[in-house]
A protein has these predicted regions:
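Conserved beta-strand positions in the central sheet of alpha/beta enzyme cores
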Residues: 32, 57-59, 95, 142, ...
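N-terminal small/glycine-rich loop or linker at the start of catalytic domains
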Residues: 1-9, 55-65, 100-111
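Active-site-adjacent beta->alpha loops and helix N-cap segments on the catalytic face
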Residues: 37-47
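Alpha-helical segments flanking ligand/cofactor-binding loops in enzyme cores
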Residues: 20-21, 45-46, 84, 132, ...
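Histidine-acidic metal/acid-base catalytic patches
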Residues: 1-27, 37, 90-92, 105, ...
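Residue-level detector of anion-binding/catalytic polar loops
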Residues: 29-30, 54, 92, 140
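Conserved beta-strand edge residues that scaffold enzyme active sites
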Residues: 37-38, 61-62, 100-101, 147-149, ...
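Active-site acidic/histidine proton-transfer and metal-coordination neighborhood
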Residues: 49, 69-175
Length: 259
């Protein structure tokens, strides 16, 4: 099983670049973070190589929204830079948000001045365009719905709000990033939703409810979800721990390794 550590949630007592060797030291092979643009990607590349780590994903957007017609030109330009960064860092997955998340995960704009028809049309247009680039470059776009509890004003807040557009785009390189924590908050019915979208799910984010802590600390039946994903649906992608420890880091690490 491929397990990734989100270093913007874990090992946060350490400086950013010191978290990479800690991921390897604690026995994990994959690492991920949000925006690449505020970091030294040459240093990150060296740290990945020195610690024999694979970069699972990072955000392909930052300051420009997928859903806003006024952002289309800048969105595409930044995405192309993200593609270059992905190749440099040997990363196969770029996360795409309806509302771009900038430094420290801050949502840039909510787009509340736009109607739903405009947002859907713009998101579809932009995804069609960047999907062609992703296919040509051998990359995967992981479209992530996010809860309004975490990002008030975010547009794609349910699995269907992203899945419907992904299916219209129809590219094998455009997938659904299913964040179990966010989707439990927004819609529940996790197993049926996973089964319904098994053909397009490309990446899993893990965190329990409430609090976004390690599996087993909240209300979600993670052993059963894992069984459904792996044994029933044959999911072989990355399970990423985007969470913070409920008690101690040692206890959290033990739980993540046992997952």
């Amino acid at each position: 099983m491929k397990k990734s550590i989100c270093i913007e949630k874990l090992f946060v007592d350490l400086p950013f670049y010191d978290r990479f060797p800690m991921v390897r030291k604690t026995g994990f092979d994959y690492v991920e973070f949000g925006s690449w643009a505020q970091h030294d990607i040459k240093k990150i590349k060296s740290l990945l190589e020195e610690n024999r780590l694979q970069l699972g994903c990072f955000s392909g957007d930052k300051d420009y929204n997928l859903i806003d017609p006024a952002h289309c030109k800048e969105f595409l330009e930044y995405f192309k830079r993200s593609v270059e960064a992905a190749h440099f860092l040997d990363c196969k997955n770029l996360v795409i948000h309806s509302n771009a998340l900038g430094e420290e995960g801050r949502m840039c704009t909510d787009g509340n001045d736009l109607n739903d028809r405009t947002k859907i049309a713009c998101a579809t247009k932009n995804l069609l365009e960047i999907s062609k680039i992703a296919e040509a470059e051998g990359l995967y776009l992981q479209v992530e719905p996010v809860s309004t509890y975490a990002k008030p004003g975010y547009y794609m807040t349910t699995s269907d709000s992203a899945a419907d557009i992904i299916r219209v785009v129809g590219s094998p390189n455009v997938k659904l990033l299913y964040d179990i924590y966010h989707m439990q908050l927004m819609e529940g019915d996790l197993v049926n939703t996973l089964r319904r979208n098994a053909d397009i799910i490309g990446y899993i984010h893990i965190g329990d409810v409430p609090g976004r802590h390690e599996p087993g600390t909240g209300e979600i039946n993670y052993p059963y979800l894992k069984h459904v994903l792996v044994d029933e649906l044959g999911f072989d992608g990355i399970f990423a721990f985007e969470l913070s420890p409920l008690t101690t880091m040692d206890a959290c690490l033990e739980t993540m390794h046992a997952f």
